[in-house]
Regions:
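Methionine residue identity
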Residues: 1-3
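Flexible "arm" and connector segments at domain edges
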Residues: 5-8, 12-151
Length: 151
């Protein structure tokens, strides 16, 4: 990886110095893109090529990843003292953080199976976020199946 030379500057969450590789300065969308690239590389290493799946394979892998996420949610749940009858439990914040990242691995994989890029993912998130804000602003009294169709 090329090193930055003779350029030193700093702005919020973006610092470049002679000691760091060029990619230490990223926008948030660059970070999301890098996460997508990292996940794609990991999936390929595991033998899952999301770019060349049939529709039937895509359906199967969405189910596979959903099942994996179900297990990761159970592991996240076990990081939190949820057994009200058991006094010995402790909150394992470190493990909870790890489980959240495991969930993200599978969530990004599902997005890739569905042929979403990091840009698609961000755009859909932003649109859905606005739908949620609008629902809250209007009291969210009824479920409108059509308010998310544009996403």
């Amino acid at each position: 990886m090329p090193m930055v030379s003779l350029v030193i500057f700093s702005k919020k969450d973006c610092t470049v110095s002679l000691k760091f590789a060029h990619n230490t300065c990223m926008t948030n969308s660059d970070k999301l893109n890098e996460i997508f690239q990292m996940q794609q590389a990991l999936n390929l290493k595991i033998g899952v090529d999301t770019a060349h799946m049939t529709d039937e394979q895509r359906q199967q892998w969405v189910l596979n990843y959903c099942r994996a996420m179900t297990q990761e949610i159970a592991e996240l749940t076990d990081s939190v003292p949820w057994k009200w009858w058991a006094k010995y439990q402790k909150f394992d914040k470190q493990n909870a953080r790890v489980e959240v990242i495991d969930l993200l691995h599978f969530l990004i994989s599902i997005a890739q199976v569905l042929e979403m890029t990091s840009e698609d993912f961000y755009a859909a998130y932003a649109k859905k976020h606005q739908v949620n804000l609008d629902r809250q602003a209007t009291g969210y009294q009824t479920k409108d199946e059509n308010d998310s169709r544009h996403i």
